[in-house]
Amino acid sequence: AINAVPDEAVDYSEDELKIVYIYSQMNAVSNFSTVILKTADLTPDQIAIVAAKQKELNGIRVAKDWERHTSDSSLSPLIGRVSSSEAGLPQEDAKDYLKKGYALNDRVGTSYLEKEYEEELQGKHTVREITVDKEGKVDSDKIIQKGSKGNNLKLTIDLDFQKGVEDILGQQLSSEISGNKATYSEGMYAVVMNADTGAVLAMAGQKHEQGAQDFKADALGTITDVFTPGSVVKGATLTAGWRSGAIYGDQVLTDQPINIASSPPITSWFTNKGSRAITATQALEYSSNTYMVQIAIKLLGQQYVPGMSLSTDNMEKAMTTLRDTYAEFGMGVSTGLDLPGESEGYIPKNYNVANVLTEAFGQYDSYTTIQLAQYVASIANGGKRVAPHIVGGIYDAGKNGSLGTLSSTVDTRVLNKLSLDSKQLGIIQQGFHDVVNSGSSLATGKAMASSIIPISGKTGTAETYATDGSGTTDDDNETL
């Protein structure tokens, strides 16, 4: 019917078009529902006219509108976005929101903190119970729930500390770029969290484009970008060895070149073509690749013999054991962070038996920075995987936009406990301590020993591929 009306018959003035626009908005909602009639900013004179005719405009009133503005901070992307009143409720979530009493044109959080804490930030609508008579006239109108303002959130992140972490990353990355050591680098990222509570104190990143001389802040990259971790996973690999019975306690194995039939040897940096008997603790301290590969071979149901061929009979079981163990620490699974949209890592479904060996020393699956932070926090706090969170407390809305009084705190959430006894956990903790603080010349983290605070840690170097305009650059990625 509308298509049958010729264009020349639709001849409205500018004022009439405004009336049609407002009327169409009014008709878009059900009876007794509230709708915000979108207009341009009203002048004081226009507001006065509406107020003077209030008795004639039953159900219509002038109200202040708002827009969400975030500060110019590197953390602003974590805040997320809010839908416009025109867009209203996201289509995919509309049904759930309507059940909770939302209106179709309510503005809601669509990403990150705004979405995660939507119900806290939104506030509550006034709920009325309206009855009508047979003629449709209002018989009674009772308020059964008073409306209230939304709450405020206080983050666990201190902006000054956050900036300090960003500056450190920026200085280090700038130095690497100047020394032509970061041509293919994707940047530098760091997450600082309280290992016992999960409170995130800083999540900082400096994103670098291949070949560029500059970089930019990228806090979101700590939860969305994945990286091949390298040797940092070796504490979890020991755990896989213990839980499967492949190794026991602080077992001594010989670090030696691993020669698989028709394949280049896998070696550790400190032995190369030689051999050295080392404990599990020293395997972490020195960052032994071949100790971990021998664990992987045992997971395959074999014992290492130079020149051997690998059996695929237990390939899936071995890879599952490694990945399930890594997941206990938070690698390859959701960390439980109070932000939607975090990556769970890149865990390829297709793999071969050689990938099982490289997985054991961190050269196959990829993880986010916050997953690796949760991994080391689980070791530091005595064996509990604690969900990280960036909101510390929820506060009432104070006067004039102030924080208000504390309403509730975000409690520590333990997701699982590690499959480690106290002796096994102690071996990993000692190994991480010795990485930095050992007197051995083979300790891989001695450069951090002069820090003013005591540090334990695990170093890792990933060997990956990078491409440029001339094709593919292969950085000696170890293959079998």
PLM regions: where:
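Beta-lactam-recognizing serine transpeptidase/beta-lactamase-like catalytic domain environment
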Residues: T131-K146, I157, A182-P229, A236-L480
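A short acidic, often aromatic-flanked loop/helix-cap motif at beta-alpha or helix-coil junctions
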Residues: E67-T70, Q162, E344-G345
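Short helix/loop capping segments that flank catalytic or ligand/cofactor-binding pockets
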Residues: E86-L89, G164-V165, A466
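Conserved, well-ordered alpha-helix/loop/beta-strand core segments that scaffold catalytic motifs
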Residues: T34-V35, V138-T183, M188
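Membrane-proximal periplasmic segments of bacterial cell-envelope enzymes
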Residues: A1-K146, M188, A195, H208, ...
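Short amphipathic alpha-helical segments
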Residues: L42, Q46, I157, F161-G164, ...
